[in-house]
Amino acid sequence: MAAKEIIFSDVARSKLVEGVNILANAVKVTLGPKGRNVVLERSFGSPVVTKDGVSVAKEIELPDRVQNIGAQLVKEVASRTSDAAGDGTTTATVLAQAIVREGQKYVAAGLNPLDLKRGIDKAVVAAIDELKKISKPTTTSKEIAQVATISANGEESIGQRIAEAIDRVGKEGVITVEDGKSLDDELDVVEGLQFDRGYLSPYFINDQDKQVAVLDNPYVLLHDKKVSNIRDLLPVLEQVAKASRPLLIIAEDVEGEALATLVVNNIRGILKTVAVKAPGFGDRRKALLEDIAILTGGQVIAEETGLTLEKATLAELGQAKRIEVGKENTTVIDGAGEHKNIEARVKQIRAQIDEASSDYDREKLQERVAKLAGGVAVIKVGGATEIEVKEKKDRVDDALHATRAAVEEGIVPGGGVALIRVRNAISGLKGANADQDAGIKIVLRALEEPLRQIVTNAGEEASVVVAKVAEGSGNFGYNAQTGEYGDLVESGVLDPTKVTRTALQNAASVAALLLTTDATVYEAPKDPAPATSAAGPGAPGAGYDF
């Protein structure tokens, strides 16, 4: 085991605070509409230019081990905020730095760190309660666009694209972000349920231009086993042929004689069919088949339910208005399932999301909800260079997360104004003793810091602006984009309540832990190995410089 070094009290804290300040100073220059870029070196490939706080934080590793521990603690604030709300990482970092800076002064003056922490916690709880009171729900597409625009550092085109995507697929719909192939951003919307399985044979294609198989008003047969014997399928194929409608077969696999017969029937025009593999694996495959069954108003033909292929009737088959099957994807548009059954299924999956223990499971369940409840929108981010596309894509991701947070918990006035209003509302809060009062003062001072930093980045005098905004009420604030005072909600400067709340909670949590730290244990630096000459002491040329 490597040797460890230990430092205590003020020495330990001051080193940790130095690390906090180095990281926070690099991150906070990106805050606000006039925030600056940060260039990140890559060990391979082009450097990355970003205004995303968490991207900057993740890149920072300091050579001094103790300073690096402090930096890692603040990095944790940014990461936690990003994971929970998807945005607000720079605000969280600025708040954490302010709480640590103010708290360090009181600890150095001899106040009890634990009472300071209790005061900080009390002030944060009161601040969050007040934040919820001034929050209002997002109701219009315009508000959604405004939230997205602010999060994308003031780029209106990104805000409009995200608002349009939500309009098209609904608040529950899946919205993904991809690299585009042109200079402009594009929005591609897939209506209905899409899964990542394509046709099993190219002979099923009936639209040669698009290279897809299109089925209008088809039946849908869902089976959880492999189909290789055509005799199993014959009874249901005859019933579908009599109805003169096409058929989509979704099974674990369709192979051998069964697949060959379906292809021949398709080519001869006897019965238009397409066979695809069922999506997913194991238990997830069963769940996805059940989703498709509910969406199309059919049943999964499975031994568990007492149904067999030979005895299947049209009543067990699902139906849809249109199905498109490509090489890699199948899209079911306007399934014939009953709305109440789909809603019940969505509710059931949401309950599973609440109980899911892993992020992967939660993500896959949310994907299923979105596919049942809405559609899938793909925002393709355009740009002239790879660096530009990457930087813009980061901002679109941030804006998308901020928008989802706004839909979830509502919105508050942006530009740091919500925290100023909260500060004014809780300014009369008192703790159980003088040290707790000091903890409350730390938070009251920290709540000004995001506005101060936004104004500083805009090149204005922070103290003057903070004083003027504090004198106002409601949505009155400073718009750093235009340099004017006014109603920020009217001018579209909004923040999601969830982002502001999460940033404050995480910043206070980590900063308070740092203030109550009294010792730091770290690995002792290794002594560099002494340089040895290749030539021994008695060798020719030893001891001479050449």
Curated annotation (Swiss-Prot):
Localisation per UniProt entry: Cytoplasm
Known catalytic reactions: ATP + H2O + a folded polypeptide = ADP + phosphate + an unfolded polypeptide
Positions bound to ATP: 30-33, 51, 87-91, 415, 495
Main subcellular location of this protein, as a coarse class: cytoplasm
Assigned EC number: 5.6.1.7
InterPro entries: Chaperonin_Cpn60_CS, Cpn60/GroEL, Cpn60/GroEL/TCP-1, GroEL-like_apical_dom_sf, GROEL-like_equatorial_sf, TCP-1-like_intermed_sf
Enzyme class per UniProt: isomerase
A GO biological-process term: protein refolding
GO MF, one annotated term: unfolded protein binding
Assigned keywords, A-Z: ATP-binding, Chaperone, Cytoplasm, Isomerase, Nucleotide-binding
GO cellular component: cytoplasm
Pfam families: Cpn60_TCP1 (PF00118)
Bridged cysteine pairs (disulfide): none
Family listed: Belongs to the chaperonin (HSP60) family.
Subunit structure and binding partners: Forms a cylinder of 14 subunits composed of two heptameric rings stacked back-to-back. Interacts with the co-chaperonin GroES.
Function: Together with its co-chaperonin GroES, plays an essential role in assisting protein folding. The GroEL-GroES system forms a nano-cage that allows encapsulation of the non-native substrate proteins and provides a physical environment optimized to promote and accelerate protein folding.
The protein's name in its UniProt record: Chaperonin GroEL 5
